[in-house]
Amino acid sequence: MATLIRSKLSNVATSVSNKSQAKVSGMFARMGFQAATDEEALGFAHCDDLDMEHRQGLQMDILKTEVPSGDPTAEGDSHYQRDGTGPPSSASKDEGLCSELSSYGKPKITAWEAGWNVTNAIQGMFVLGLPYAILHGGYLGLFLIIFAAVVCCYTGKILIACLYEENEDGETVRVRDSYVDIANACCAPRFPKLGGRVVNVAQIIELVMTCILYVVVSGNLMYNSFPSLPISQKSWSIIATAMLLPCAFLKNLKAVSKFSLLCTLAHFVINVLVIAYCLSRARDWAWDKVKFYIDVKKFPISIGIIVFSYTSQIFLPSLEGNMQSPKEFHCMMNWTHIAACILKGLFALVAYLTWADETKEVITDNLPSTIRAVVNLFLVAKALLSYPLPFFAAVEVLEKSLFQEGARAFFPNCYGGDGRLKSWGLTLRCALVVFTLLMAIYVPHFALLMGLTGSLTGAGLCFLLPSLFHLKLLWRKLQWHQVFFDVSIFVIGSICSVSGFVHSLEGLIEAFRFNIED
């Protein structure tokens, strides 16, 4: 009897407890919370993890590792995949962890080595067009060289800031790997691929135009070095392109990279020779020719030339990711752009003071014939050795975006199962080399082409997109002065980009109409 009473009391207590828990759970549910037992808590925690991964997968890009066998899951990756299909499987997570751990063993570059790479990008051959920018801009052109250095340094920093986000513990972690990843994150979730495609198109245009400029400058330099020879500038461009055809067979840049240091040293020697010659004529410098006013029609072209000479944002995310100490990135950007600003300003001013209104689009064309031939031969060698770098980068972007996206690719893979380049893939590479030749033949205007490229893609990749992405991704964390800087850069960059593009086109049309040769 006592046992029966005890069991009934226990049942009543249990039912009361269940009802009270149900009421409390209902109350919490109406407030937006959910009560759970210990066993259910594990399930809810797992669901929360999956939900968090899914939401992050909508916003972040996923790196897919493809293997020749065609099995996309054979090699995993701990990063998010590009197509936003959700988190990888547990097997791929384990393999991705192994790949992450193995990546720690890869050699990293120091801040000095990173600075050397940035210096090579912003102190290349295209500084030869800066005196021409001073010709049409005067002192305002000199100010623009300084201003462009400050802005490009700032936009490079904010572009890298877009690679990072704070986790739940308040720690800043790197969640993106490239310029394309940042663009896709800004357009997600509605258009997760749009931003990356825009950036890819801009990169391809800039890289191909860089290749065209190398062919143009090679033909220009050879023609002006040997004017007595019965060979036109177009013929010299064809000869230069014939030497560049082996670039179509490139599988990697190991062979080319061996010449990078030699190219940089040669260019440094050339700059020293030009400045030394200019200093030898310091008594004849035409200070009165440096204008305080600008040529309204041609100054926007100068803006494009100056901006194009500072472009390095394309490879900054990869460079920062390979640094031993990413914290030193800001310091590295500061001293590289300060050095570039000083050297470019001095080179442009000294060269313009020497030749004043006779300054040509490529400043070495103003040198005496004896010195010009030697200097130009070095420059042509540097241009030909520099051509494979942007060419290979453009080929990689084209192959990844058009030929290597699996089922979503527009065209079949240009590589066979054994990794060899197919014949039609080789034909496309040769066609790209020939395209750069045709553009160089029919548009042989170095400064106008450089101004056009700088206004179109240079301003977009260096000014407009970094400031726009910074506002989009980090809006809630930005202070008022950062918002002001970003908006100002975007507005000024848009105005300069449109005006430079329009005036560069007008300059090209005028050159064709009156058959003006460089």
Curated annotation (Swiss-Prot):
Subcellular localization: Cytoplasmic vesicle membrane; Presynapse
Superkingdom, taxonomy of origin: Eukaryota
Catalysis: reaction(s): 4-aminobutanoate(out) + n H(+)(in) = 4-aminobutanoate(in) + n H(+)(out); glycine(out) + n H(+)(in) = glycine(in) + n H(+)(out); beta-alanine(out) + n H(+)(in) = beta-alanine(in) + n H(+)(out)
Pfam families the UniProt entry points to: Aa_trans (PF01490)
Segments of this protein annotated with the region Disordered: 66-98
Cytoplasmic-facing ranges: 1-125, 219-258, 320-334, 398-431, 476-482
The keyword Transport is annotated on this UniProt entry: yes
Function description: Antiporter that exchanges vesicular protons for cytosolic 4-aminobutanoate or to a lesser extend glycine, thus allowing their secretion from nerve terminals. The transport is equally dependent on the chemical and electrical components of the proton gradient. May also transport beta-alanine. Acidification of GABAergic synaptic vesicles is a prerequisite for 4-aminobutanoate uptake.
GO molecular-function term, one example from the UniProt record: glycine:proton antiporter activity
Organism: Xenopus tropicalis
Membrane topology listed for this record: Multi-pass membrane protein
Primary location class: membrane
GO cellular component: cell projection; cytoplasmic vesicle membrane; presynapse; synaptic vesicle
Gene name in the database record: slc32a1
One example of a Gene Ontology biological process annotation: beta-alanine transport
Entry protein name: Vesicular inhibitory amino acid transporter
